[in-house]
Amino acid sequence: MSVTMRQMLEAGCHFGHQTRFWSPKMAPFIFGHRNKIHIINLEKTLPMFQDALKFAKQVASNRGTILFVGTKRQSREIIAEEAARAGMPYIDSRWLGGTLTNFKTVKGSLKRLKDMAVAKEAGDWEKLSKKEALTNDRDLDKLQKALGGIQDLNGVPDAIFVVDVGYHKIAITEANKLGIPVIAVVDTNHSPEGVDYIIPGNDDSSKAVLLYARGIADAILEGKANSVQEILTAVKEGEEEFVEEGKAE
């Protein structure tokens, strides 16, 4: 779960945006500028990233869910792969308004997605006309693209992890309304407002995005492993206590 300064430098996490596109609220995390590009102070970023990793691990150890959100072209594949590796839901296509604040409606769409997938797998569509089957295929593709990453989500998540707050303002606003903690990568051109665990850093480089997403995924896997170990320990202690009581009788 550990991340080093060297890894962050090699991934280009320190490169911000052009100085004319900046948010003054990111000033505390900016080291300076070079060739009209802001340079992010990784000495500030590293401990903040580590705090975010600790939080992600804690959520996972409590058997919580963290929703990964990254819909930018250079983030999509990474977000989907790392979330899947960690066994967590993700949104790598367009964020649908109300995904969190109107989850009841989203749940209905998720049920439709599952029902359609089951019907297709069972061969039910073979009984339909060619036109009807084609329409169903298109509808299923649309639902899969929009909701495929959250099809196993049974309720609102315990936290969300966002890459690029500018792209996902609606997601952060919805999380804030529901009191869901937000972990987010914030570049120099955006405000960190609404983010509980800020990771000041480059949100455009795929190498940097991979470093953040892999770190969060690793932290989640560690947390899950801890949770399983605690359960096994509790079961073992319970069995030993039962044996001791049996001997006493």
Swiss-Prot record:
Q: Does the keyword Ribonucleoprotein apply?
A: yes
Alphabetical keyword list: Ribonucleoprotein, Ribosomal protein
Task: Select a single GO molecular function from the record's annotations and give it.
Answer: structural constituent of ribosome
Q: Does the keyword NAD apply?
A: no
What's one GO-annotated cellular component? Answer: cytosolic small ribosomal subunit
Q: Which domain of life is it from?
A: Bacteria
One Pfam family, short name: Ribosomal_S2
GO biological process terms, semicolon-separated: translation
Q: Which family does it belong to?
A: Belongs to the universal ribosomal protein uS2 family.
Q: What is this protein called?
A: Small ribosomal subunit protein uS2
Source organism per entry reads Polynucleobacter asymbioticus (strain DSM 18221 / CIP 109841 / QLW-P1DMWA-1) (Polynucleobacter necessarius subsp. asymbioticus)
